[in-house]
Each structure stands twice: as structure tokens, then as C-alpha cells.
């Protein structure tokens, strides 16, 4: 069968869709947000493919995977095994790296185990073991006529007169020895100083290299290894000395290593992991700047922040008072005025035993002689000893991940880090960018034997590195933690892994793989997808990127609008056919008949600036950047150029620290000037709005409080005496107690992610039956949570407080979203727009700074148009917006562009351009300007 046949698809908002999709083609599904693209691609096609796979397994295997419900569809035929690559499955485990996720690290472990050369950490010489046969062959290759001495090192760096040693050698028939480099005849008296370390080598034989001496040499080497326990020194008369060893150890210090095998290179196994940080590369330590954020305060004035919330604080403070009194430390002096020694005593204590005598808050007498442990040591001890997850989470707020002082972030132990290939250990190789790592692998100098051994594994490593390079990730390193990757990056990594697997006959379903990718790298991503197609796979890609749509084999436009107004196939066919279809909104934007208009003039701003000076976090090259206030500012640049570091790590965290005294540690820079011109900071990132199913758009934006009030004033609620709290699923009373109002139960899978299953008592409604009996306009509170924003907007049209908040959610393109949709199921783009909606409800101050990280994620061009109207409204009120963005329609709207580059990773981190869109297109160095020309 050469097509996938779908009949009667009704999942979510789909309206009985019938469609045939060609197999072994690149199919792009597009449409406005909430039109039903994901419902068709993921919830119908992929879900059915997955369900059929699970059904084919044994009942034993199925019990671990749980039952997957059949999607609401009459018929699907022609399905292949399905693999989904979305944005929500990023691994947050600190042990996961780019190398482990792509499996390149597994191949590197194998490569180092087979051709790596171990070195002695002390003497920095290769550790090799050689048989007597190999030693003989090497020596016989010396030039003919070379004079050599075969020496056996029997004493190395030992004190003593060694009289017994010399006597035994005489008895065994040896005539000469070399002591500390001097040759002695054993017939003469040899006197050595008792307290000086000596080296003694037995002269086993003296030879001239020529034909016919092989068997004598072999015997001499054999004798030498027996005498010394495996070592031979070949001293070339008038030349160098060569040390051979039969053992896998350093010939100088006997440093030895277990046999090289892949597992010793794993930082997740005890054989290879650094014993101090257990293979994490960092340790959680209390941070002085977080514990004492305000150095202008004194100890008596509450400088130690955790002491404000800590039980037993009274005891700790009284101990601190007695301690400071003993060491004459003034507790009324600001922390910044204390000497380094005084501050260290307060933080880390002393080794002196002190008598602590006082009465606690409860009136109990305390009288003990003990050592004062210091504030930092006390907090770290409390963290280790507590059984309360609440206390642990609270204390973690004062901790930072500090690089392990033993392995310096390498995660591996010393012996593993002393195994090299071409001068680099496995950590050095993983620290190279993907591009440099590929270059290193291509230029490896190996012996014939090594090349033969590593041929297959090297090919696999190069292939996988090439795929990562081809999807625009050449700036990443293999050591990069998977938890720090954006949704787009992690998706492209998994895409590269799939290309590397070379599977055929697979149905891949992808969710916006172009997220976070600069236009320059987009074509490489498209080429990778076309390569997967050419292997004989079908790709269904949910995407809004115009280039991807234009190069698709088949384009499906779902719409016409969102929610109940969508769910239909508006147009399907080749990109040209869709562009010529007047009913298709996507077609009109693709063909240029409809577009986002570029502003006629740019805003002048208010004349004030935020200025970052000397920024050098990550790859930033000590740059100075000015952000003009009262403008729409766009920060652009290729992936990995340093945009997020500059805006999120340095600017945002520094401003937040100054305005809100936050505990975050900003990235490295000399200073940030102009913060006094701001009174509010709003950061709209793609982080989840909550980690549990309790969080949802209604609770996050506050509209749920108003909805609960509406239910509390209904006639039936008043008769029963129910107040607003009765309709909360977070407190006892109205909620279902079987699931504590979650609507789902969490099943811990231990080594797998937790699984949530619907509560069998309330059937996922969150409330008990009595609460569900209270209705407003025929709907109970649970049914309202199940409404989309758009439906709820109509439903509550007579309640202005509710309606206004829902209108903002609609304006940011979330009309299709259910009010009670749980936070973990929201995509990054959806989460960021929920946050934006919450902020838009507040009154503008004219001195606010809004920072948005790729707000167009998941948005159709038509939705981008609406979003830009909202953002422009914010700037027109006098506030400032800084947007990190690749979308050229957004960049074209900016009053001021800051373009970083020129490349990603080490080759980025510089300011390429600052100014208006009209000027950047004239700058030949800017990739952004090059692509922006077409839009302007």
C-alpha cells in the first residue's frame, strides 16, 4: 500500500476528517494554533501506530506499558511502525549529556578501550605491556653494529646498603651491576650510604646487534624479566635507554592499570566515575552570595538569610553570639566591613572547643562544650540529615552546582583521564564542539593495526557527528548536559540519532523541528529530513516554517481557524496547489498574497539605556551591549551565538537581583548600568508553568479564582453553605480525596518517568459528587475546567472579570486551550503565552522590561501577526521589550536589533551589528541581515 488512509478522524476538535497521505514522502501539516494539526498527527496517526505496536506485544510486556486507548477514528490503513520526536521529552537527568543521548559516547568508550594509550600520571610515559618476542623484534630492528647492554632493574629508589642483594648476585654468577648509573664489578667491594635512595641494575648481557644473536638476546631478556619481575632496560652504548615491561604498568613507578575495557570510561559506573562527585562533574555546595545576599547588612541585622526561616534559629543565633564574642567579631558591623578571617570564622567555624551556655526560646537550659561548625557547614549538615523534602527543597535554594575540585568537571577518575588518543583523553574529545570533534576524528593518526581495529567504530562516530553537524548543532559539545538544551535542540539531537540508526519503512512524526534554528541552518535541517525520506521512511512534520512547507512533497492545511472553528482539512496537495487555494490561510501567506506588514517608521525610545559591560559568560567575548529603553528590541544570531547567555543569564538575572533581591547568580560581566530606570521585570520563558497536574492555565492566570466566586454565589451553593474554597481542588472539602484533587494518580516507575493514570473514583474530574451537583448555566465546575478558552469566553460573557482575563488568553492565540489542561502537557510555546497572558492583565507602568525567549514557538504566521499586535501595544505604553527570536517577521518589526555571532559556540559571542532592520540588511557580515532582505 502506497498511502496512509484515514477515515472519520474525530479526536479532540477534528470534524470527521477523511484524508489519504502518500507514504515515503515528506508531509507537512500546518494551520493556526489549535486548528487540530497535532490532534491529527500525534493524537490520531502516531497514537494508533503506537497502540498497534503495544497490542502486538505479549500480555507480560503490556502490563508495564499500560493500556493505550484507541483514538477516535473509524479507520486507519497503511500505517508503518511509528516513532514520535516531540519537544516535551527532554531528559532532565544530570547524568545525560549530548554524547550519551546520541550514543556517540558509547562508541567513544569503545574506541578508547581498543586504541587508547594509557600514560603514567607521574612520569607521563606510555604504559604498555610487551611480550619477550615483541621486545626481541624491536631490538633486532636496531642498526647493525649497535652495542647494547641488557639490564635488569632489581632495586628502584630504595634506601639501604644492599649488601645481601650484592651477595646473592655473586652467588648466582653475575659479574657486573650498574649502581646509580655507574658500572661496578661484583668482585670488588661496593659500599653504599644507608640513608640514600639507590637504583641497582644487573648487567645480564652485553651484545652487538648482528645476525645470529637473536636466540641469545631472547634468553637474556627472559633472564632479565625473571630477575626484575617483568622489566628490562636496554642501554645503547653512547645513546639512549629504552625501558620495556612485560606488565601493564609504568616501568619507573609500577603504576598499573586494569585492562582497558569500555566500562572504565563510563562516568555512570564505579570503575570510571570520579570517586568524589560520583561522576556528576559537580557537587552541590552552599553559596556564600546566596546565604548572605546583602553584604551591607550586619549579622544582627539579618545578613544570614536562611536564619530568618529556620527552626531552632534561636539556638543557632545564640551560639553565633557567643562565638563572635570569643573571637571579638562585631555583630553590628556590615558584612562587607568584616575582615576575610572574621567572615571565614563565621561561615566555616573554628576547631576550638567553646562552652555554649544559654536558655532557648522554650526556656530550656543549654550548656555544652563543643566546636562551632560555622553557618555554611551547619546548612550543609542540615541538608544531608533532613528527611523533609520541603526543607531539602528550601535549602537547595541557597546552593549552587560547583565544579568538582578533583576531576574539574571531567566526571572521570584520574587513571581514565590519563588514557590518550593523539594527545587527547575522552574528556578532551567530548569538550570539542561537534564540528571540531568531527575534524579531530577525520585527522586521527593511527597505526595500521589500530586503524583496522577501529575502522567500524570510527565510521559510526563520524556518521553520527556528521548528522548532528547537518541539523545545525555543530556548536554543541558532547559534554553539554541534556537538561540545558532547548526543545528545538533536543528534538534535532533525537532526529540526528534516528538518521544515524538508518531505519527504513518507519513513520516519523515530528513537532516543529525548526524551533530555535536560524534561517542560515534551516536548509541543512530540511536536507536531513529529505535524507530520512530517501531511506524509505514517511515523515509527518507539524511545522509553520515557510521554507519547510515549500519543500514538502505534500502539504496539509488544517483549519480554517482554531478550536471548534477548526478541525477540517482546508487544503491538501503539493505546496503549489495549496498556495493556489483561496480558502487556505496558509496558502495565502506562503504565496505572499497576505503578509505581516513592516512598520513604516521605527520608535525613537525614551533616550534611556540598559547597558551590559564586559559580558564574558560561556562564549561571550567580553562584549559591551546597550539596550535602548522604550523600544521593541530583537536579539538575533545563529544558534549558539550567545543570545540566551546575554539576555537570560546576564541581563535578566542581574536586573532581577537588583529589583527583587532574588537569589539567582547572574552570568559573568563587569556591570549592568541603567537598572534604576526600571520598576518591573517580566520574563516570559518556555519553562513549564508548573510541574504537576495541579497547575493549569486557569489557576496560573488567576481566572479560576473568579470562576470559583461565580459558583459560590449560585443559589444552590448558598443553600448548602458552600463558599469559594469549596470549588478549589487544592484543599479538602470539595475535592476528590481519592486523588487529592489531582484528577490523576501518579505511579512511580523508578527508572522510568512517572506515569499518571486517571483517578477511578472521580474519573478525572478532580471533585467529589456533591461539589459536582452545583451548576451554573447547566455546567458544573469540572465541566467548566474542561471547556476551551473560546467556549468559556462565550459562556461567561456576562461576567466582566472572567471575560476580560479569558479575552487576553484568546488574544495570545490560546483560544483552543482547555482551562484545566495540566501544566506538564503544555508545549514550551504554549507555556510562554500563558505567562504573557497573565502579565497582560496588569496595568502598564511605562518602566517595565519584558524579556521573551522565542515567543513565536508553535505559532502560525497568522498567530504571529496577532502576537505582534499585543507586543507593539506593550511598547506603545512606554514599556521595553527584548525578544530572542529567529522569526524574520518578528525581527522586521523591531525598532532595534542586536545581532550576535558570527557563528555558534567558540566562534560566536561577538556583537556583529546593532541598529535598525533597514541598516542590518546593508551589513555583509550579518547572516540575519542577509535573510531579512527578502522580508523588508
Descriptions of predicted regions:
Residues 1-936:
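Conserved phosphate-binding elements of NTP-dependent enzyme cores
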Amino acid at each position: 500500500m502506497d498511502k496512509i488512509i484515514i477515515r472519520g478522524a474525530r479526536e479532540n476538535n477534528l470534524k470527521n476528517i477523511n484524508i489519504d497521505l502518500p507514504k515515503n514522502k515528506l508531509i507537512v501539516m500546518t494551520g493556526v494554533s489549535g486548528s487540530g494539526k497535532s490532534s491529527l498527527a500525534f493524537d490520531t496517526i502516531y497514537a494508533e501506530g503506537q497502540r498497534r505496536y503495544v497490542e502486538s506485544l505479549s500480555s507480560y510486556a503490556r502490563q508495564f506499558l499500560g493500556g493505550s486507548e484507541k483514538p477516535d477514528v473509524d479507520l486507519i490503513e497503511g500505517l508503518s511502525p511509528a516513532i514520535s520526536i516531540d519537544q516535551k521529552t527532554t531528559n532532565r537527568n544530570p547524568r545525560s549529556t549530548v554524547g550519551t543521548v546520541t550514543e556517540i559516547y558509547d562508541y567513544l568508550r569503545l574506541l578508547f578501550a581498543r586504541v587508547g594509550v594509557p600514560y603514567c600520571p607521574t612520569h607521563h610515559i606510555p604504559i604498555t605491556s610487551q611480550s619477550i618476542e615483541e621486545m626481541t623484534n624491536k631490538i633486532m630492528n636496531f642498526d647493525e653494529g649497535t652495542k647494547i647492554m641488557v639490564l635488569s632493574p632489581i632495586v628502584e629508589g630504595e634506601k639501604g646498603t644492599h649488601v645481601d642483594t650484592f651477595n646473592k648476585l655473586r652467588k648466582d654468577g653475575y659479574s657486573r651491576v650498574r649502581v646509580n648509573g655507574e658500572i661496578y664489578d661484583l668482585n670488588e667491594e661496593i659500599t653504599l650510604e644507608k640513608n640514600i635512595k639507590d637504583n641497582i641494575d644487573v648487567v645480564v648481557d652485553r651484545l652487538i646487534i648482528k645476525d645470529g644473536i637473536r636466540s641469545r638476546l631472547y634468553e637474556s631478556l627472559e633472564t632479565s624479566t625473571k630477575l626484575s619481575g617483568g622489566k628490562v632496560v636496554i642501554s645503547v652504548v653512547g645513546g639512549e635507554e629504552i625501558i620495556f615491561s612485560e606488565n601493564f604498568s609504568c616501568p619507573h613507578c609500577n603504576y598499573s592499570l586494569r585492562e582497558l575495557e569500555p566500562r572504565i570510561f563510563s562516568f555512570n559506573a564505579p570503575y570510571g566515575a570520579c570517586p568524589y562527585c560520583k561522576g556528576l562533574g559537580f557537587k552541590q555546595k552552599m553559596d556564600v552570595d546566596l546565604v548572605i545576599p546583602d553584604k551591607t547588612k550586619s549579622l544582627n541585622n539579618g545578613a544570614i538569610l536562611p536564619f530568618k526561616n529556620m527552626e531552632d534559629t534561636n539556638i543557632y543565633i545564640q551560639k553565633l553570639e557567643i562565638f563572635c564574642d570569643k573571637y571579638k567579631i562585631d555583630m553590628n558591623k556590615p558584612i562587607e566591613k568584616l575582615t576575610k578571617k572574621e567572615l571565614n570564622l563565621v561561615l566555616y567555624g573554628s576547631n576550638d572547643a567553646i562552652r555554649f551556655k544559654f536558655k532557648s526560646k522554650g526556656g530550656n537550659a543549654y550548656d555544652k562544650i563543643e566546636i562551632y561548625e560555622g553557618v555554611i557547614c551547619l546548612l550543609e549538615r542540615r541538608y544531608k540529615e533532613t528527611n523533609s523534602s520541603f526543607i531539602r527543597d528550601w535549602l537547595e535554594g541557597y546552593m549552587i552546582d560547583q565544579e568538582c575540585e578533583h576531576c574539574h568537571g571531567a566526571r572521570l577518575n584520574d587513571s581514565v583521564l590519563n588514557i590518550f588518543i593523539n594527545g587527547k583523553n575522552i574528556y578532551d574529545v567530548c569538550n570539542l564542539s561537534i564540528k571540531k570533534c568531527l575534524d579531530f576524528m577525520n585527522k586521527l593518526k593511527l597505526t595500521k593495526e589500530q586503524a583496522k581495529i577501529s575502522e567500524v567504530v570510527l565510521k559510526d562516530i563520524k556518521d553520527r557527528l556528521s548528522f548532528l553537524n547537518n541539523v545545525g548543532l555543530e556548536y554543541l559539545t558532547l559534554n553539554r548536559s541534556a537538561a540545558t538544551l532547548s526543545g528545538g535542540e533536543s528534538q534535532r539531537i533525537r532526529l540526528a540519532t534516528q538518521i544515524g540508526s538508518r531505519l527504513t519503512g518507519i513513520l516519523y512524526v515530528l513537532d516543529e523541528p525548526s524551533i530555535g534554528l536560524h534561517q542560515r541552518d534551516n536548509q541543512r535541517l530540511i536536507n536531513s529530513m529529505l535524507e530520512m525520506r530517501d531511506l524509505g521512511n514517511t515523515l509527518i512534520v507539524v511545522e509553520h516554517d515557510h521554507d519547510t512547507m515549500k519543500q514538502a512533497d505534500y502539504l496539509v492545511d488544517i483549519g480554517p481557524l482554531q478550536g471548534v472553528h477548526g478541525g477540517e482539512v482546508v487544503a491538501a496537495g503539493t505546496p503549489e496547489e495549496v498556495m493556489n487555494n483561496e480558502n487556505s490561510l496558509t496558502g495565502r501567506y506562503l504565496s505572499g498574497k497576505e503578509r505581516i506588514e513592516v512598520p513604516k517608521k521605527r520608535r525613537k525610545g525614551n533616550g534611556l539605556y540598559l547597558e551590559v559591560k564586559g559580558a564574558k559568560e560561556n562564549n561571550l567575548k567580553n562584549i559591551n551591549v546597550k539596550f535602548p529603553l522604550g523600544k521593541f528590541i530583537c536579539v538575533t544570531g545563529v544558534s549558539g551565538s550567545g543570545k540566551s547567555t546575554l539576555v537570560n543569564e546576564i541581563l535578566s538575572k542581574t536586573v532581577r537581583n537588583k529589583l527583587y533581591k532574588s537569589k539567582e547568580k547572574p552570568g559573568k560581566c563587569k556591570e549592568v548600568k541603567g537598572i534604576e530606570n526600571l520598576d518591573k521585570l517580566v520574563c516570559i520563558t518556555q519553562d513549564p508553568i508548573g510541574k504537576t497536574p495541579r497547575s493549569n492555565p486557569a489557576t496560573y492566570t488567576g481566572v479560576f479564582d473568579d470562576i470559583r466566586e461565580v459558583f459560590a454565589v449560585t443559589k444552590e451553593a448558598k443553600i448548602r453553605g458552600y463558599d469559594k474554597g469549596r470549588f478549589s481542588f487544592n484543599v479538602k472539602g470539595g475535592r476528590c480525596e481519592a486523588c487529592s484533587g489531582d484528577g490523576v494518580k501518579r505511579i512511580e516507575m523508578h527508572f522510568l518517568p512517572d506515569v499518571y493514570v486517571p483517578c477511578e473514583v472521580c474519573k478525572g474530574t478532580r471533585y467529589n459528587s456533591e461539589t459536582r451537583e452545583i451548576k451554573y448555566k447547566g455546567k458544573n465546575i469540572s465541566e467548566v475546567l474542561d471547556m476551551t478558552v473560546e467556549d468559556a469566553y462565550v459562556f461567561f460573557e456576562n461576567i466582566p472579570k472572567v471575560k476580560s482575563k479569558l479575552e487576553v488568553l484568546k488574544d495570545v492565540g490560546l483560544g483552543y486551550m482547555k482551562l484545566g489542561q495540566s501544566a506538564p502537557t503544555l508545549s514550551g510555546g504554549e507555556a510562554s503565552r500563558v505567562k504573557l497572558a497573565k502579565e497582560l492583565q496588569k496595568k502598564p507602568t511605562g518602566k517595565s522590561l519584558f524579556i521573551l525567549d522565542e515567543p513565536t514557538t508553535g505559532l502560525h504566521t497568522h498567530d504571529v501577526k496577532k502576537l505582534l499586535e499585543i507586543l507593539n501595544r506593550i511598547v506603545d505604553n512606554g514599556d521595553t521589550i527584548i525578544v530572542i527570536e529567529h522569526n524574520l517577521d518578528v525581527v522586521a518589526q523591531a525598532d532595534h536589533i542586536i545581532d550576535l555571532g558570527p557563528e555558534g559556540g567558540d566562534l560566536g559571542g561577538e556583537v556583529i551589528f546593532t541598529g535598525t532592520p533597514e541598516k542590518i540588511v546593508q551589513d555583509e557580515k550579518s547572516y540575519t541581515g542577509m535573510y531579512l532582505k527578502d522580508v523588508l
